[in-house]
Amino acid sequence: MEEHRKRHGRRLDYEEKKRKRTAREAHKASADAQKIFGHKAKLHHARRHAEKVQMKKTLKAHDERNVKQKDDGAVKEGALPAYLLDRDGQKDAKALSSAVKDRRKDRAAKYSVPLPKVRGIAEEEMFKVIKTGKSKSKSWKRMVNKATFVGEGFTRKPVKLERFIRPMGLRMTKANVTHPELKTTFQLPILGVKKNPQSPLYTSLGVLTKGTILEVNVSELGMVTTGGKVVWSKYAQITNNPENDGCINSVLLV
């Protein structure tokens, strides 16, 4: 075949046919994925899930490639104030990370919260039943109707294993946090959901409803402890209904 190709060349429409065949591959793979079932389907979806996770990691690595990294050697000894020393160096960053993790373990109940009581939310209001299967006869999946928070490195489970679906349009990453003493509002990144008063399940899903205790990043506010350390995160309680307003309003717990 190689010899014949060298002597006579290719068909005139070879490149066009090859382009069309490549373009059809995605559609063919999609059709095959919808037809297969049983053990073969599980293997196929597991393989595709692994490919997508790897692709996501590769894209993230490409995005971070052009980000300028801070040079630790550029800052001379004594050039920074004492309360900013925790932000420099791998050793100090690790200590700060450990402090944040320890703080997350603290009970949210020790604060006197602005909203001590909230109304209960029925399961029918919280979840929408999703019919699945070829004849739409299975109803074990649920879609969350409320605003949610998922972490930055969140990856969805394979379709056959994902019970709770959290829509992209209802995922929140920032909250409007009001300082009760300063009477000032800041837009701060959310670090996690500490406690949802409705149910532990909603806490694990990261559902954001009225009265939920959030953990927000307050490093930009320049708050310092009595020991001179920068405060990295603090708790805040949601005071509105995010699914109705499209934003999160909360009060900082100081």
Curated annotation (Swiss-Prot):
Protein's GO biological process = maturation of 5.8S rRNA from tricistronic rRNA transcript (SSU-rRNA, 5.8S rRNA, LSU-rRNA); maturation of LSU-rRNA from tricistronic rRNA transcript (SSU-rRNA, 5.8S rRNA, LSU-rRNA)
Domain of life the protein comes from: Eukaryota
User: At which positions is motif Nuclear localization signal?
Assistant: 5-12
Keywords from the named record: Nucleus, Ribonucleoprotein, Ribosome biogenesis, rRNA processing
Start-end of Basic and acidic residues biased regions: 11-30, 60-73
Gene3D superfamilies in UniProt = 2.40.10.310
Q: Which Pfam families does this entry report, sorted A to Z?
A: Ribosomal_S8e
Q: What is its main location?
A: nucleus
Instruction: Output the InterPro entries linked to this UniProt entry.
Output: NSA2_fam, Ribosomal_Se8/biogenesis_NSA2
Sorted alphabetically, the Gene Ontology cellular component annotations on this record are: nucleolus; preribosome, large subunit precursor
Protein function: Involved in the biogenesis of the 60S ribosomal subunit. May play a part in the quality control of pre-60S particles.
Indicate the quaternary assembly. Answer: Component of the pre-66S ribosomal particle. Interacts with NOP7 and RRP1. Interacts with RSA4 (via WD repeats).
UniProt similarity note? Belongs to the eukaryotic ribosomal protein eS8 family. Ribosome biogenesis protein NSA2 subfamily.
Name of the featured protein: Ribosome biogenesis protein NSA2
Q: What is the lineage of its organism?
A: Eukaryota, Fungi, Dikarya, Basidiomycota, Agaricomycotina
